[in-house]
């Protein structure tokens, strides 16, 4: 399957792609993971889908949207700082123009082939993060993610470090962690970017 990666701001993302992105998030987070989120007509959106947001997403050759990230600057409101700050403990929330937050990572398992335990869509989505970082002078990403995604990141050899008290926290029914992911040569090599 041939995958194309797209990069758009909240203002520039084509409406049809944005709707597909919200539907993928609904499928992954509401249906598959059973998270209790605000949804509307089979789409998931939240208070962080704002003008400052940037979206990276993958489409297969028939135009089906199969993966996405949301990226927010840490110089404004973002999920780790403003919703899940308990993951930071006494640590100050990152706030720097070269650090961005990753959220709403989703891959459509129905349209992604596995290559050595990691789907081609997942690998390309992680490669796109490196290219995005290079383009926008991003030194690192922070993210609130599940312990299972952290395990995937480590299995891929991606450098990362837990933030805050470095413990797993239960957010709803999801075992979650806060991570710092540097955009460095080790990251580039781990994803073959």
From Swiss-Prot:
Q: Name one GO molecular function term.
A: N-acyl homoserine lactone synthase activity
Q: What class of enzyme is it?
A: transferase
- Cited function: Required for the synthesis of N-(3-oxodecanoyl)-L-homoserine lactone (ODHL), an autoinducer molecule which binds to VanR.
* Keyword annotations of the record: Autoinducer synthesis, Quorum sensing, S-adenosyl-L-methionine, Transferase
Mention one GO biological process in which this protein takes part, according to its record: lactone biosynthetic process
Q: What is its EC number?
A: 2.3.1.184
What the record says about family reads: Belongs to the autoinducer synthase family.
Any keyword Transport?
no
Q: Which organism is it from?
A: Vibrio anguillarum (Listonella anguillarum)
Organism's domain of life?
Answer: Bacteria
Q: What is this protein's name? A: Acyl-homoserine-lactone synthase
- Which chemical reaction does it catalyze? a fatty acyl-[ACP] + S-adenosyl-L-methionine = an N-acyl-L-homoserine lactone + S-methyl-5'-thioadenosine + holo-[ACP] + H(+)
């Amino acid at each position: 399957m041939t995958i194309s990666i797209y990069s758009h701001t909240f203002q520039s993302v084509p409406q049809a792609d944005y709707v597909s992105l919200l539907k993928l998030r609904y499928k992954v987070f509401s249906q598959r993971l059973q998270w209790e989120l605000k949804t509307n007509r089979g789409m998931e959106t939240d208070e962080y889908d704002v003008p400052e947001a940037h979206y990276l997403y993958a489409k297969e050759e028939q135009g089906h949207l199969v993966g996405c990230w949301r990226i927010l600057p840490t110089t404004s409101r973002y999920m780790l700082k403003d919703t899940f700050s308990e993951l930071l403990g006494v640590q100050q929330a990152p706030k720097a123009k070269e650090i961005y937050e990753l959220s709403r990572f989703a891959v459509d398992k129905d349209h992604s082939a596995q290559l050595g335990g990691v789907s081609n869509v997942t690998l390309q989505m992680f490669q796109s993060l490196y290219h995005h970082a290079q383009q926008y002078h991003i030194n690192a990403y922070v993210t609130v993610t599940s312990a299972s995604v952290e395990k995937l990141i480590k299995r891929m050899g991606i450098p990362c470090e837990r933030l805050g008290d470095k413990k797993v926290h239960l957010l709803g029914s999801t075992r979650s962690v806060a991570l710092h992911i540097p955009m460095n040569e080790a990251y580039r090599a781990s994803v073959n970017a």
